[in-house]
């Protein structure tokens, strides 16, 4: 397992380096020439958007460095939450963020955990300590991220969440036999196309993250299935199924929409530099 892990990390580093060589020099040159102006970094999904672009192989183009995706603000992926993420009539502002209210059937300890998080104002949120958000929360934070499509994998580059990157293998492999032996924040992800949707199956998580900012917990038994569908030029629909018998009595499903930000690139974000007074984050 250790040899496989080392090879996997080297492959990830090589893939990331190749992507950066393809993308970053041009971006840096543009900024030096005064051409690096970016648009707004917080946007909402738009109505009446043009069709999604496609790659030469016919698959939907999920971005590939031409811009970034941004979830605006999603606190609670069950639909109970703040403002725009709540289930309400959003008029002509485009697709709703969280699309429906769901009531996960939680085990008693998980239900108590969520109530305690609410009571103490999320003072123990792992992300507040600059730890990775995990999944599916990584796709619901207010930080831009990009998706790159390579012949045998997808690469997710995140601005937030400790500047994480994520690899989704699309070369037809199955989950490794020891995927759950060495759990991680983002687990092991295997993807395949179903029509215009990229379906990503992930296992092998540790239990050190929350599913969302509302504090929905999970265990190392977590199994996440995400379906990414670029429904138009400006909208990415994310459908998520949570299956964790250690925290929930049965699988549950949620979904949300996030907006396309053309020309936006993830910036350097060092969480620790602004995280100087944790001892006073005491909640109630």
Model feature map: region roles:
Residues 23-284:
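PEST-like low-complexity, intrinsically disordered acidic/proline/serine-rich tracts
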Residues 11-22:
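Bacterial N-terminal signal peptides
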Residues 1-8:
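N-terminal secretory signal peptides that target proteins for export/translocation
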């Amino acid at each position: 397992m250790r040899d496989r892990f080392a090879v996997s990390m080297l492959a990830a580093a090589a893939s990331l380096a190749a992507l950066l060589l393809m993308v970053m020099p041009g971006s840096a040159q543009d900024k030096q020439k005064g051409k690096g102006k970016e648009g707004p970094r917080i946007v909402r999904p738009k109505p009446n958007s043009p069709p999604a672009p496609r790659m030469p192989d016919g698959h939907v183009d999920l971005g590939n460095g031409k811009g970034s995706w941004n979830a605006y603000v999603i606190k609670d992926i069950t639909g109970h939450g703040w403002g725009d993420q709540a289930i309400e009539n959003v008029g002509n502002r485009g697709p709703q963020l969280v699309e429906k209210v769901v009531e996960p059937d939680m085990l008693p300890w998980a239900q108590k955990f969520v109530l305690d998080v609410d009571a103490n104002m999320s003072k123990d949120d792992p992300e507040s300590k600059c730890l990775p958000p995990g999944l599916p929360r990584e796709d619901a934070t207010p930080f831009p991220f990009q998706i790159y499509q390579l012949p045998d994998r997808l690469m997710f580059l995140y601005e937030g969440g400790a500047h994480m990157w994520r690899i989704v293998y699309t070369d037809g492999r199955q989950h490794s036999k020891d995927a759950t032996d060495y759990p991680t924040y983002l687990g092991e992800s295997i993807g395949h196309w179903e029509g215009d949707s990229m379906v990503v199956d992930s296992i092998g998580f540790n239990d050190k993250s929350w599913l969302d900012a509302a504090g929905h917990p999970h265990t190392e038994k977590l199994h996440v299935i995400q379906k990414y569908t670029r429904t138009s030029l400006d909208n990415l629909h994310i459908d998520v199924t949570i299956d964790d018998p250690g925290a929930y009595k049965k699988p549950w499903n949620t979904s949300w929409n996030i907006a396309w930000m053309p020309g936006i690139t993830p910036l350097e974000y060092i969480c620790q530099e602004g995280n100087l007074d944790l001892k006073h984050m005491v909640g109630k």
